[in-house]
Amino acid sequence: MKITKITSHVLGYDLPETLGYSQQYYKKRTSHIVEVETDEGVTGWGECFGPGNIAFANKGIVEKVIQPIVLGMQALDRDVIWHKVYNLMRDHGQKGMPLQALSGVDIALWDIAGKAANLPLYKMIGGAHRDKVEVYGYGMMLRPENINSLISRFKEESAEIKEMGFKALKMKVGVGPKDDIKLIEAVREGIGDSFRFMVDANHGYTTHDALYVGRAMEEFSPYWFEEPVAPEDLDGYRELRALLKVNISGGEAEFNRWGWRKLLESRGLDIAQPEVCALGGISEYLRVLALCHSHFTPVVNHVWGSAIAVAVNLHLLAAMPPLPGGLFPWEPMLEFDTTHNHFIDDLLTVSLDIKNQVKSNNGTVSLPNGPGLGVTPQRDFLNKFRIDS
């Protein structure tokens, strides 16, 4: 079964309201879906991490760099393809966009392999350790509002996400240390004393400010403090983990096994958050997962993007071995975007229906059971939302 064509579908639409995090505001949602075709008529689907103009840069890498390398190769030779592409791109970047582009292609090749074997992805990996996956909802995004408006909205929105049935929720911070503490307090007030919530700084702090905010948030008992400092600041991560009671999480901005080896050896993480659509795809994710578990670091995948990314992560989380195991093992969670997202709600021929499942199944969702990823994008949807710039 030979690869005959690779197509990047960059999708976009204007959001009904501005969203943001510590690094930027944005008014347009984008997604980068990868389609790999074969000479036997089997098509695979994948996704590349990277918003906005990053998606167009990655499209160029997928179609102009990776495609010429792999055309005519056997689609089932995933590991051969991964290393051939990586080795030829290594001199031009071992992290970032080359890996994001490779991720989408690799995911699509796993989808093809599952379809060829007539097995769902989680079976291809080795089987499901759980038949349902717990889900947390993220929202409480920043907007260009004054702090009083943000406080009011965060309190209200957090209560709404809890009411939707999610097992936990995640909020953004990034408007300044003192005001961020006010936002954290508002969310705790909105959800009550015992509901689990997490705080995501998107590497917006210096180590000093992260320590200030981290100590202040301990009063409100968040479950983790995500990306408190820049991903390059391994010493900062290690210092914060040693000095704070809250779990320190991160890793969405790390790539491949070699980057993850350094991150894990620094001992700066309580919880690892690999991003399969960025770090090198499923092939590399499985190697990174093994590294995390060899360091006894629990994993909660970072998830951002379309329903393709959601489906991939459902399979990966189902197939994730328990760490450390036991009668009542620690359970990973699926990260789910509760904000306006056509690319989750409307992309597929058959919706994953995450929100309704969460509401009716005590905060959990079932696994896709079709071959490969078990999901298929609507061709008309791809055509409707495709953008060229």
Regions found by a protein language model. Give the residues of each.
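Metal- or metallocofactor-binding catalytic centers and their adjacent structured scaffolds
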Residues: 37-116
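Metal-dependent enolase-superfamily TIM-barrel catalytic cores that perform enediolate-based chemistry
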Residues: 126-244
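Structured beta-strand/loop patches that form or line metal/cofactor-binding pockets in enzymes
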Residues: 1-40, 45, 49-52, 341, ...
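Shared catalytic-loop signature of beta/alpha-barrel
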Residues: 215, 221, 232-249, 254-364
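A cross-domain feature marking catalytic cores of carbohydrate-active enzymes
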Residues: 48, 137-139, 171-173, 199-203, ...
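Conserved, mostly hydrophobic/aromatic
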Residues: 3, 41, 66, 105, ...
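Extended hydrophobic packing segments that form well-structured cores
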Residues: 364-389
